[in-house]
Design a protein with these regions (language model features):
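Extended, alpha-helical interaction "stalks"
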Residues: 207-408
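Leu/Val/Ala/Ile-rich N-terminal alpha-helices, chiefly Sec-type signal peptides and the beginnings
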Residues: 1-231, 348, 352, 363-408
């Protein structure tokens, strides 16, 4: 029966999709209940597994993904007679399953296999800090559950589509469907390889470099606040907005005030972006962090606080968009101001944390202390932030002193 290999391949791929789509689902929430102290042997074991993961398992995973892609003939969109080597597909799929299982076992053994010190007492553990393990778990989960498992599913769909096309070769719709599935599968392959490379880089990079990655991603995500502002700052979309009949007769005052308040967010967005780009793009040899003495608590706070600021600004802007769409006035000025006070405190604490973990390293070309350069930079940002905050409070109160220009 010529369809038997197809059935076997589809069944195996579906089985692996179901298995690996649930992989690591408890990894992020599991806690080790062991009470023994971490030993030198434990550390050696963890470091050995991390080395194996970096130098053997992850490179082999990339090779196996490429092999499965090749056996599925993903790069050939012109072949009108889709004839897959299903024996090779079965072999490559089995190899991919084995390496995934080894990687998951390795990560679980490293992160959960023996107790670690608390987040405030792991500064001496180098690659075995909870901060790094948390990133490793998160990225591995995304790789396995949201990418490689989908590769199994899409591969199964492709084989089924090719089988259907072989049974009805005159139907052009089958060819179109095969091309669509190939394109989607190839995208998953490329993304899986990128994520595998990201895991390898995570194992090689210092704590500071990993925090810089988080900062840079956060800086790029801040555009979401400006995109929300466009909803209330673009007159062309006003005709499509809802109108609350109880607030139509306001001569546009409600929306005009909301637009002014929304625009007063712009300086904060710019200042946060400046801060994040400054510290995320400075080369590590010029970024004088005491990286080997930072524990997980400090690293978590450094990477998390900018995200907290952007999330808070996004929520506030979403509230303004809702008011604008329904033509409602801003009634909770005090609460919004209180929220901005919290954002300001987080901004200050982030700047202070960065300065606190700097050490005085000299720049040979300028003969200046990097600590002082960063310190002055943060002082300037703080002054501009408070000017923007004063301007914001004036605007949200519904008035601005005469001849005062908005801060941007």
């Amino acid at each position: 029966n010529q369809n038997k290999p197809s059935v076997e391949a589809v069944d195996l791929l579906q089985l692996l999709y179901n298995r690996h789509s649930l992989s690591l689902h408890l990894l992020l929430s599991e806690e080790d209940d062991a009470t023994e102290n971490l030993t030198i042997n434990d550390m050696s074991m963890k470091e050995g597994l991390l080395n194996e993961l970096e130098t053997i398992l992850l490179p082999y995973l990339t090779a196996r993904i490429a092999a499965l892609s090749s056996s599925l003939n993903l790069n050939n969109f012109a072949n009108k007679d889709p004839d897959l080597n299903l024996t090779l597909v079965l072999i490559n799929t089995s190899h991919l399953d084995i390496i995934l299982s080894e990687i998951m076992y390795c990560i679980e053994k490293v992160t959960l296999g023996s107790p670690l010190p608390t987040e405030s007492d792991d500064h001496y553990l180098n690659r075995c800090k909870r901060f790094r393990f948390s990133l490793l778990q998160t990225r591995a989960t995304i790789l396995v559950r949201e990418n490689v498992s989908l590769l199994f599913q899409k591969s199964s769909e492709l084989i089924q589509a090719c089988t259907t096309s072989r049974d009805d070769p005159a139907n052009s719709e089958h060819q179109a469907r095969i091309c669509d599935i190939k394109e989607a599968t190839l995208m998953i392959v490329n993304n899986s390889c990128k994520l595998t490379s990201s895991l390898t880089n995570l194992l090689q990079k210092t704590d500071v470099a990993l925090v810089q990655e988080e900062w840079l991603a956060t800086a790029q995500s801040i555009n979401s606040v400006l995109e929300l502002l466009a909803h209330i700052n673009n007159p062309s979309i006003e005709s499509n907005l809802e109108r609350d009949p109880t607030h139509i007769v306001d001569n546009g005052k409600n929306r005009k005030h909301i637009v002014e308040v929304g625009r007063s967010f712009i300086p904060f967005v710019k200042l946060i972006r400046l801060l994040l780009y400054k510290i995320s793009t400075t080369s590590e040899n010029k970024l004088p962090f005491i990286s080997n003495t930072m524990n997980t608590d400090k690293l978590d706070r450094l990477s998390r606080n900018p995200k907290v600021i952007i999330e808070a600004l996004t929520l506030l802007m979403q509230g303004l968009v809702t008011l604008y769409q329904t033509n409602q006035p801003i009634r909770d000025q005090d609460q919004i101001c209180a929220d901005f006070d919290t954002i300001t405190e987080t901004f200050h604490s982030t700047s202070l944390d960065i300065c606190r973990y700097l050490v005085p390293l000299r720049d040979p070309s300028a003969d200046l202390l990097w600590e002082n350069i960063f310190g002055d930079y943060f002082v300037d940002l703080t002054i501009l932030w408070h000017k923007a905050l004063l301007n914001f409070r004036t605007i949200i109160g519904g008035s601005r002193p005469e001849n005062e220009e908005p801060v941007e």
